[in-house]
Amino acid sequence: MAQKKGGGSTRNGRDSKPKMLGVKAYGGELISAGSIIVRQRGTRIHPGVNVGVGKDHTLFALVDGHVSFGTKGALSKHTVSVTPA
């Protein structure tokens, strides 16, 4: 005979791993070509000069240089550019 009641079950026993999003290289930093500048969901920050966009909207440097953040256009879209060093 069981000495304890059954534990039952739950539907909540899992969690997703963190996605590590955010800015990886800040303004003024010297980075190399291919370095990730921003990991994001959607284009919260738009690519500027010498910056490429990955299929998951990750922004990365196309050339070696210094990172600079700014705004562009009438709606003040946030942009990131790389100035060649």
Swiss-Prot record:
Gene Ontology CC annotations of this record: cytosolic large ribosomal subunit
Compositionally biased spans, kind Gly residues: 1-10
Keyword Mitochondrion: no
Keyword Phosphoprotein: no
GO molecular function, one term: structural constituent of ribosome
Transmembrane domains' residue ranges: none
InterPro entries for the chain: Ribosomal_bL27, Ribosomal_bL27_CS
One Gene Ontology term from the biological process aspect of the record: translation
PROSITE patterns for the chain: RIBOSOMAL_L27 (PS00831)
Chain segments carrying region Disordered: 1-20
Keywords: Ribonucleoprotein, Ribosomal protein
Pfam families (alphabetical): Ribosomal_L27
Disulfide bonds: none
Gene3D superfamilies documented for this protein: 2.40.50.100
Similarity field: Belongs to the bacterial ribosomal protein bL27 family.
Protein name according to UniProt: Large ribosomal subunit protein bL27
